Amino acid sequence: MSQVWHNSNSQSNDVATSNDATGSNERNEKEPSLQGNKPGFVQQQQRITLPSLSALSTKEEDRRDSNGQQALTSHAAHILGYPPPHSNAMPSIATDSALKQPHEYHPRPKSSSSSPSINASLMNAGPAPLPTVGAASFSLSRFDNPLPIKAPVHTEEPKSYNGLQEEEKATQRPQDCKEVPAGVQPADAPDPSSNHADANDDNNNNENSHDEDADYRPLNVKDALSYLEQVKFQFSSRPDIYNLFLDIMKDFKSQAIDTPGVIERVSTLFRGYPILIQGFNTFLPQGYRIECSSNPDDPIRVTTPMGTTTVNNNISPSGRGTTDAQELGSFPESDGNGVQQPSNVPMVPSSVYQSEQNQDQQQSLPLLATSSGLPSIQQPEMPAHRQIPQSQSLVPQEDAKKNVDVEFSQAISYVNKIKTRFADQPDIYKHFLEILQTYQREQKPINEVYAQVTHLFQNAPDLLEDFKKFLPDSSASANQQVQHAQQHAQQQHEAQMHAQAQAQAQAQAQVEQQKQQQQFLYPASGYYGHPSNRGIPQQNLPPIGSFSPPTNGSTVHEAYQDQQHMQPPHFMPLPSIVQHGPNMVHQGIANENPPLSDLRTSLTEQYAPSSIQHQQQHPQSISPIANTQYGDIPVRPEIDLDPSIVPVVPEPTEPIENNISLNEEVTFFEKAKRYIGNKHLYTEFLKILNLYSQDILDLDDLVEKVDFYLGSNKELFTWFKNFVGYQEKTKCIENIVHEKHRLDLDLCEAFGPSYKRLPKSDTFMPCSGRDDMCWEVLNDEWVGHPVWASEDSGFIAHRKNQYEETLFKIEEERHEYDFYIESNLRTIQCLETIVNKIENMTENEKANFKLPPGLGHTSMTIYKKVIRKVYDKERGFEIIDALHEHPAVTAPVVLKRLKQKDEEWRRAQREWNKVWRELEQKVFFKSLDHLGLTFKQADKKLLTTKQLISEISSIKVDQTNKKIHWLTPKPKSQLDFDFPDKNIFYDILCLADTFITHTTAYSNPDKERLKDLLKYFISLFFSISFEKIEESLYSHKQNVSESSGSDDGSSIASRKRPYQQEMSLLDILHRSRYQKLKRSNDEDGKVPQLSEPPEEEPNTIEEEELIDEEAKNPWLTGNLVEEANSQGIIQNRSIFNLFANTNIYIFFRHWTTIYERLLEIKQMNERVTKEINTRSTVTFAKDLDLLSSQLSEMGLDFVGEDAYKQVLRLSRRLINGDLEHQWFEESLRQAYNNKAFKLYTIDKVTQSLVKHAHTLMTDAKTAEIMALFVKDRNASTTSAKDQIIYRLQVRSHMSNTENMFRIEFDKRTLHVSIQYIALDDLTLKEPKADEDKWKYYVTSYALPHPTEGIPHEKLKIPFLERLIEFGQDIDGTEVDEEFSPEGISVSTLKIKIQPITYQLHIENGSYDVFTRKATNKYPTIANDNTQKGMVSQKKELISKFLDCAVGLRNNLDEAQKLSMQKKWENLKDSIAKTSAGNQGIESETEKGKITKQEQSDNLDSSTASVLPASITTVPQDDNIETTGNTESSDKGAKIQ
């Protein structure tokens, strides 16, 4: 089956190739005779294929020389499909067509009879692989072996060419004809005119060609150029022949003709030139071959994969084969005088015609209309069956060719004009080319192309007008064609009748062969006035511009491409109307019933003879059926004309695309192709669609597979599903498993760079496959979290500190010395051998002696590096060259210099080793300490007040955020510490005592006070007896004195003050009291007997008593409250609370920090002590002299004793200032192996501890808070009420914005927890039992302060603002004292609180009474103008109301009015008496029955009276009325 290739998007290379081997200097030689010679490039066993070329869409211009010939440049090479000589790329083959498979070509092996080429450069050039095009292209691969084809033996006789013998034709050549270049004409080429005795040898060689595949030489660009140059040189006097040959190649590239069509047209064109015809075999695909003799009258044998056929070039006008003069516009041979020779064309014999009729029946395809994007540049073709005289046919053919050249040049000029116009806008030019290529590839309607071009050139109307010239418009040309056809109709009538008779006689014999060879179909068309020469006399082609746009055709060839998803993009056959008449006899049919081919049997009824005749009369009524499937598109039937009727040119029919609209589908595929962006994936996508069209895939599978390609593009995928009619199935919602939430590890707590702690909600998840061991040992808390970092920077050595960097530099310097010393030593040994050899040489030997590179040794670079190191870089190269060229002179000098350098380098290395050793001793252990160097700066920031408060605040926020459900209990504390070892308390006190003793920041009295404060605080808080603390400190000081060697034990013992046992922390906190005790002790030496308590400031005593008194008088009393308070009392306390402010919290945090660090060191004490005792000297460190004795000399090394005690000793020396930091750190590094780095800042932390302890004494509010702690701590019993009162008292000494902390100590477990307390947090830990919770709530509710656990933002004012008296402010203060809120209150209200629901219930019969008369006010000023105005206004309003139509006075007579007036006067008198009786009420108030209070006292929420009471004045904010509506108060808020 024939395969036509087309590359719609191939871009021609404009780079011109190099000049041909046959240059212009060889053109002046005399042309030798071509008979009996073959050019060097003609190889009988080698061939290439004919690639495609799009003449207009891929090439911008077509240059021709002055003679009309196309220049032999890269354009000519592209016609044969070759890339430019400098390019390694393969020729462009169907890059954007549907055929996207790799194709190979297989040159045939070189036979022994093929003449060798004299041009070695051409024969030895690199291969130029080209795609195989032809019938066998689908069966060929790189590893296929070409089948040998035996060429038949012909007995050739001298033949005439156009009626002339070869001798005569040679004498009639033009005088100015140029000679064949020497590079083209081989000297030893065989003579083709001789008898074919050598043909048998060729056949024998062909049989063995299978074994000679490895000997063939693939062709390249130069071979094709040589052949083109040979054609051009052969027809130098007839440039039209050369141009027609190029046009044939263009037709093949544009898929207008196939490989047999090329063979047929080339054989006809080069008739009489057997060298060119046989040379063309070189470029044919496998299975094709042309064989001809030197006699042009002999038939030409064409070998194809279907078999061997014979083409007779000398046939009758009615036959299939015509002369070149008839086919090509009659280019006759001319003699030297330019006289044309008439062509003698005899009739074709019936035997020859019968052999060709078989093939012609197979190739009766519709006329193919090809288009290269712009105009249809096809000449009206003369039918082959018309016999026109030379004188008459020459002029029309020449005119037609001129028109072709003009039209083609106009198209080229138009494209160049567009490119020049939009030089600065290349996108427009590219878009224009894309429009043309899309028109060819996708068969778009011409209207759509014109619309796109109109939009593109909307700002260039001149270009748009020029483009309209190329649109199809065949009215004028059609008329001329009809007239021309009528002139020659009569002349051809007799020839047609004769040809019809011969064809009918041969028809029946060819029926069976037609069916067998039906599958081999080749498109037949004419181009530039050349018929296809297939025995199908076709009517004249329509004029230029009369072709419809390319549409889908129906051929077996295209149907096969459709199955392979390889539809040619723009080459589709159009329905053609083939003339039917006497000239149709070669098909073996009569005029009465013209049958259709097998591909159109389904359309037989539609194109019946009656309908065909109607279509002849009405050509415009022909409406081809549009269908996208191959084989279903009808082709215009042949026109059944009577022989006497002149065939007419049919009118242009409407394009098939006009009846269908595929714009949306085409747009979808364009978008899909751009979206996929990969040719291979797009091909797979098309294969899936093909499987669905073949019913291999169902709709669900199709959508599922297409989802892989288009699923991420919602628009395309939705359109596709709608187009194929896919309806999504409803999703099944049963058994949906709840997916676990995705956790953002960036928000979790980090441990190092790689681990994150999971929250509690994600840990300990239910797992049925775990046992107790799994729950115990498996990790559910920490997860690995990689750190994403770029690896583009490559590997960098990990150097963690500057000391490790120093070790790196030392090693690099030591390596450099070792490297050059060893290299120099090797070079010295090499040169010593050479110098010793030179000393034994004679003078002549020394002069001629030279050294090779490497100096005769294995290394080629060592001595060069050494010489360049000793000498500078520039002179080093000179020395190396001299050492190679003149070793006798250079070697001794260089050897002496190298020995001198060796001694110098070794001496310097010994000196540097001392420096390196000292540096390594200093930085060796520091380089291993990766945490200690950065810890000192980080620790300073972590122990600041801001950081410590931020730490506990952030922990509280995290705990609150992680509380998932409201029933989840609140966290008890934020920080927890354990103090298992009490001896460390004594160590901390000893370090603090050391610092206080040696510091100069405090005065001596403050130093003593600080020491006592620390001891008494630790004794009181941790429940340690003071005597034990004194004994421990005394023993510590004795150990220190013994170790220091000083005898001051008596002085220490004398300092023991007996009064310290009876002094309390309160005495220390009050400066004046402590100073009095200190002074009396110095005077008497004994404890003073204080007859009265120390004096305090009266304001302080009054404030404390007021707070305590208010706290003890709750606003609610009764059995319920007493029961809750009595059951909440705790006996034998084990848990103590310290409500602290910021200063106390910071002090305690420093204490815990020192304790944790000392505890960590003490826990590893046993192991470190054992290691020190068993530690041996490191051998390599000793050998390298890395061990230093400075620590032992300074007494800082650790011996085999208690390592923890030695750490304390060094710490005291550091605090005293006797030891430098670097030696203290170095000593800890060597003893604890970089694990004691937290003690590097022990002096700084101790200093901060003493600083904050001093703040506890100096800050007045902090001292009061500490006094409250002492008072609570000394109480043996406590209750929830006492703790709440304790908290309220502490809060009274703090500002509203200051933070409060609760430090809780458990005496039994020695555990301390710190909790950050907000305003609405509970004072104590939330009880677990419901009864305990209820009792705690009642206790807090009974106290006058806001109930704990109630958010303050939910509290509201317990009265309405509109009830406030005039002149009284909202906060309860009086603006005017003239108002008197006197009243009577009787309270017998009793309430109950439900333990579970906390609802408030009022008992029946209980009530509250509160009355206050509005007249109980001080008299106002009578002459007040404002008051008078208001009174008069009210009187006037009342009088108007009474006197109105509906008023009370309306129906009263005068007597009634007087009676009412009298009653009014009596009312006034009663009011006056009531005012006089107010004095008596005031006197009884003093006796307790009636009480007078100021309004400010009533509105003060802090003052409360005991309820229930018989008669009292109730404050407004605690007004509990009989309705029990207390929701507006804070109590009601908690109850509800």
Swiss-Prot record:
Compartments where located: Nucleus
UniProt lists compositionally biased (Polar residues) regions at 1-25, 42-57, 308-325, 1496-1527
The superkingdom of the source organism is Eukaryota
**Mind listing the GO biological process terms from this record?**
cell division; cellular response to heat; double-strand break repair via nonhomologous end joining; G2/M transition of mitotic cell cycle; meiotic cell cycle; negative regulation of rDNA heterochromatin formation; negative regulation of silent mating-type cassette heterochromatin formation; negative regulation of transcription by RNA polymerase I
Which parts of this chain are annotated as the region Disordered?
Answer: 1-128, 149-216, 308-363, 475-511, 524-556, 1037-1057, 1079-1108, 1475-1536
Species whose genome carries this gene: Saccharomyces cerevisiae (strain ATCC 204508 / S288c)
Instruction: Give the InterPro entries listed for this entry.
Output: HDAC_interact_dom, PAH, PAH_sf, Sin3-like, Sin3_C
- Gene3D superfamilies reported in the protein's UniProt record: Paired amphipathic helix (1.20.1160.11)
Compositional bias (Basic and acidic residues): 166-179, 1484-1495
Alphabetical keyword list: Activator, Cell cycle, Cell division, Chromatin regulator, Nucleus, Phosphoprotein, Repeat, Repressor, Transcription, Transcription regulation
Annotated Acidic residues bias: 1093-1108
UniProt function note: Catalytic component of the RPD3 histone deacetylase complexes RPD3C(L) and RPD3C(S) responsible for the deacetylation of lysine residues on the N-terminal part of the core histones (H2A, H2B, H3 and H4). Histone deacetylation gives a tag for epigenetic repression and plays an important role in transcriptional regulation, cell cycle progression and developmental events. SIN3 also has a RPD3 independent function required for normal longevity.
Q: Which residues form the PAH domain?
A: 217-287, 404-474, 656-727
Q: What else is known?
A: Present with 1660 molecules/cell in log phase SD medium.
On this chain, the residues bearing Phosphoserine are 137, 316, 1046
Q: Any idea which GO molecular function terms this record carries?
A: identical protein binding; transcription coactivator activity; transcription corepressor activity
Q: Name one Pfam family in it.
A: Sin3a_C
What is this protein's name?
Transcriptional regulatory protein SIN3
Binding partners and assembly: Component of the RPD3C(L) complex composed of at least ASH1, CTI6, DEP1, PHO23, RPD3, RXT2, RXT3, SAP30, SDS3, SIN3, UME1 and UME6. Component of the RPD3C(S) complex composed of at least EAF3, RCO1, RPD3, SIN3, and UME1. Interacts with ESS1 and STB1.
